Amino acid sequence: MAFCGPRTAARLSHSTRALHYTHRGHVSQRTLNEVVIASAARTPIGSFQGSLSSLPATKLGSIAIKAAVERAGIPGDEVKEVYMGNVLQAGQGQAPSRQATLGAGLAISTPTTTINKVCASGMKSIMLAAQSLMCGHQQVMVAGGMESMSNVPYCMSRGATPYGGVKLEDIIVKDGLTDVYNKFHMGNCAENTAKKLSISREEQDSFAINSYTRSKAAWDSGLIANEIVSVTISQKGRPDIIVQEDEEYKRVDFSKFSKLKTVFQKDNGTVTAANASTLNDGAAALVLMTAGAASRLNVTPLARIVAFADAAVDPIDFPIAPAYAVPKLLSEAGLKKEDIAMWEINEAFSVVVLANVKMLDIDPARVNVNGGAVSLGHPIGMSGARIVGHMAHVLKKGQFGIAGICNGGGGASAVLIEKL
């Protein structure tokens, strides 16, 4: 007769826990599943050192994830894995996506992965989650992106302190906004694109003004409110502050646009602080699942993911990379550009959208119809997820939409969805 002592019992207890976690493992299959977007939620976008600056990216991520799961109408333990984009990770502690996931109240057995594809991080998270769902590795996942540019630290090289003092580098610039191959700011790449495609300062200013106008109209009409989850800021003894609206689009003076100096090229430059995106804080999350899981859970999806693609060009040409990803999408889906009702091309700079509209020869009236990053803000790890989620909310049944976003290093990602 076997005797079960304390050590044996401990081993059995550990084994039982291990077995309990195995339901979140991966199993592949031969046929691909259809993947749907069950919900999409995002925080408001805060200005740099603005309304959301007291919260780290991981907390913003938790808020977005929790809201997305609640709006999907499913129990949290149905989520079997989480991917979250996050670019400027320095100083946040280990595994930002894990922090965001547990902070959202999801099960401790939920695996997580943090994705860094610079500005395309949030969108790439959606693409990777969709792949996992298509292949049957998981049935329900959360994907999104988060960034708090207000909380990004400075750094200095390790080693002996040199004579004459130390040099601090801004991680926002070093890891987020610098072309490492040409050793200059991404804005210089934007200037290069403007010169190559003959896009003027006036065109960029006009586009930026239109972005602000469209964002205001979208907010005034209540169109954006459906995707927002409010953020409560504790004031330690004073009444809490509740942030429930994007901050950036209201901070504009159109009379100053033409008077601003160019930032990256003094002579014959075109890019200014007004026609480029800003530094911001925010997070977005989507619940993705197989069509089978949606049926089992009685979920009515917002949209289905039809196709997705990446592209890469010379690093200096990163602004035009979406124009190389989009044709892959259309070819894979068997669609023409005329079939696309809505385009979301991330406004890292006004010239990015103008360049891609020109290269793809698409109708500008269908592009960024509710504004974009120039006016709403660009928390770089969040933006790719934000534009996919926005499309999922505002497209009409049966319409197709394409979201595309460029990223530093010469890359781009793009996603094609159909509204259900």
From Swiss-Prot:
Name assigned to this protein: Acetyl-CoA acetyltransferase, mitochondrial
Single GO molecular-function term?
Answer: acetyl-CoA C-acetyltransferase activity
SUPFAM superfamilies in the record: Thiolase-like (SSF53901)
Q: Which residues bind K(+)?
A: Y212, A273, A274, A276, V374
Q: A Gene Ontology CC term for this entry? A: mitochondrion
UniProt superkingdom? Eukaryota
Provenance organism: Xenopus tropicalis (Western clawed frog)
**Catalytic-site annotation from UniProt:** C119, C406
Tell me, in one coarse class, where this protein mainly resides: mitochondrion
Q: Give the main EC class.
A: transferase
- The entry's keywords: Acyltransferase, Fatty acid metabolism, Lipid metabolism, Metal-binding, Mitochondrion, Potassium, Transferase, Transit peptide
The record's comment on protein family reads: Belongs to the thiolase-like superfamily. Thiolase family.
